[in-house]
C-alpha cells in the first residue's frame, strides 16, 4: 500500500464581507459566458440567488437558475438541474446555500462531463473526468460542502444516501461571506454548527488522520467552542459568524482528508429513511458513537485530548462526552432518536446500511452489526 498522503482543498477560497463581489469579479475575469445557479427555494425566497444572478449578469454572463433543491437532495433534483444546465449549455455552476445546494450542484457538474447516472459514482473516486468548474457560495457554517470532495445524494427508492467521495467534485472556488449567514435561524445555526463539530471530532479520531488534519480539527473545535453558542444566541454577531466560517472550513479541511466515521455513516441512513436534518442526526449520535469508540485506546486518548479544548482541566474522554451532551441541551437539540421519530423496527436495516456507507471505513473501531444496533438503541433510549 502506498504511504503517500494527498491533501485536497479548492484552489481558491474567499472569506469575509465582500466575498460575493470578489467571486463575481473572478468569474468575469475568467471570461465565462454561461452559468447555472443551483440553489433552494429558501435562498430564492430571500432574494440571495437573485442578487448573485444580477451580479453575474452585470458582468456579462447569461445565467440560468435551478432553485428546487430539497433539504436532502435526491436523484430527481440532480436530473432536473442537469436538464437546465444542458438546455443553456452552461460552462460553470454556481451553488448558493448550505450542503444541500452544494451537493446537488456537485452532482450536476460531475454528470455534465462524465455522463451516466449519479449512482454510478457512489464510493471513492469513481469518475474519470473533472467536473465543470463549481463556484460554491456558502450560507451556513456547518457542512463544508463548499470546499470538500464529498457529495451526498438521496436514493429515495432505496431509502439510502449515496456517499460520493471524488476528487473531481472539489469546487474550483469556495466562498464564505458571513453577511449571508446573519439571517440564519437559531435552530439551523445549531444544527449546521454541530455538523462542523462532528467533522472535527470524527476526523481527529479517524484512522486516516495526520498532523495537518489534526491541527485543522483542533483549531476548528476551539473556534466552535468559542463562537457557536454566541452565533446561536445572536445571529447578527459578526465575530461569531466569522469565526464559524473559519471553523467549518477548518473542519472541512480535516474530514476532506482524514474522512469521517460511524456518526456520519449512521446519520446518512437516518436522513435517507426519515428525511431528518443531517446536522441534528449528527448531534444526537455524536456522543454515543464516540463513547463506543473508546474501546480503541488511541481514540480514547484523543477524545481525552479534545476535553482540554472544551475547557476541562485534564485529559478525560468522559468529559468530552459530557461536553457534547451539554452543548446539545444548550441549543435545544432533541435528546434522542426517539424524539426524532426513529422506529425500533428499523434498527437492523439502519445498521446494515451504515456498514456499507463509505464513511465507516475510517472509524477507529470496526463494529459488528450487533454493536452498531446497540449504538442506535442507546441513542434512541438516552
From Swiss-Prot:
Q: Where in the cell is it found?
A: Mitochondrion
Question: Where are the coiled-coil regions?
Answer: none
UniProt enzyme class: oxidoreductase
Q: Does the keyword Calcium apply?
A: no
InterPro entries from the UniProt entry: ADH_Fe/GldA, ADH_Fe_C, ADH_Fe_CS, Alcohol_dehydrogenase_Fe
GO cellular component terms given for this protein: mitochondrion
Assigned keywords, A-Z: Metal-binding, Mitochondrion, NAD, Oxidoreductase, Zinc
Q: In the record's cofactor note, how is the cofactor described as bound? A: Zinc. May bind iron when zinc levels are limiting.
Q: Per its Swiss-Prot or TrEMBL entry, what cofactor is needed?
A: Zn(2+); Fe(2+)
Q: Which E.C. number(s) belong to this protein? A: 1.1.1.1
Describe how its activity is regulated. Inhibited by EDTA.
* Induction (record text): Induced by transcription factor ZAP1 in response to zinc deficiency.
**One GO molecular-function annotation for this sequence?**
metal ion binding
Catalyses which reaction? a primary alcohol + NAD(+) = an aldehyde + NADH + H(+); a secondary alcohol + NAD(+) = a ketone + NADH + H(+)
Q: What does this protein do?
A: Reduces acetaldehyde to ethanol during glucose fermentation. Specific for ethanol. Shows drastically reduced activity towards primary alcohols from 4 carbon atoms upward. Isomers of aliphatic alcohol, as well as secondary alcohols and glycerol are not used at all.
Q: What else is known?
A: While ADH4 is expressed at only low levels in laboratory strains, it is often highly expressed in brewing strains.
According to its UniProt record, which protein family does this protein belong to? Belongs to the iron-containing alcohol dehydrogenase family.
Subunit-level organization = Homodimer.
Q: What is this protein called?
A: Alcohol dehydrogenase 4
